[in-house]
């Protein structure tokens, strides 16, 4: 039972071994060339129940795997005495969150986490040692199934090809990943998934739509300390699909946060590569925010040139044309150009509040 409240059919596989191979040196992972002994699809609510599945008699545990967004994967399951297996994703996630909730004493925020001076925190924001923030919305914000399917499809790496290979038109130098606001509106950032080995930190900034931003005139506001799923293949994770942070607009004139982003501002996105300290190291404690591998901006002109002198596009933003209130955002943290190192979607509270002519449509 994957526990989806809305209609969402999931394809899954069951293996007699862990289908993921992890590189112990850098935490990267890849799928092994092994075949599952069972494949099936859930019903439209993410549930599956069937007798007669043939499980080899000599195995005592199996691995449940799915590449569908919103599913924990892979999950090791023990075969029951009656030779059955069961899985409830809500209970599984709850158990992981309970394991991650033990605090460690340090010094800076209320939970005593240190962070870089360049970060501004939302009012009352803090996080636990795994990077799960305390200001998440009470309810998960899961988009409609067709949006999840489309996001999965666009960022799929099947056949050794990725979004950069499949959609070169998004990388011709004209792509704008920042989001211009055309009507006062509330804005939320919702976690979808991450396939990154790194522990990345994600935030945002704003600037007047009519102006060109510079490093000196943007205020970087923290949204997610550790943009990693709680079931991260190797290491420390914090989030599940649907975890939402309601963003706030920083008004420079009043020096205060406001709930709504005003017409005439543009929202940019910011990823600090390896910005979250997953283990104590070099005087930093687990949960601290550090320089890591440096910043990546959605505003391409803010990115440092590579060795070839090129300022690379680090994000891609794609608009759901049906609602015009959802924008999928993929981040690229390093060099493989798959743009799924952190996948979020932006939820715009008001209809017709973003410039449709700037943000390309999410392919269907």
Task: List the model feature ranges, each with a label.
Residues 1-340, 349-364:
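Extracellular distal adhesion/interaction modules in secreted or cell-surface proteins
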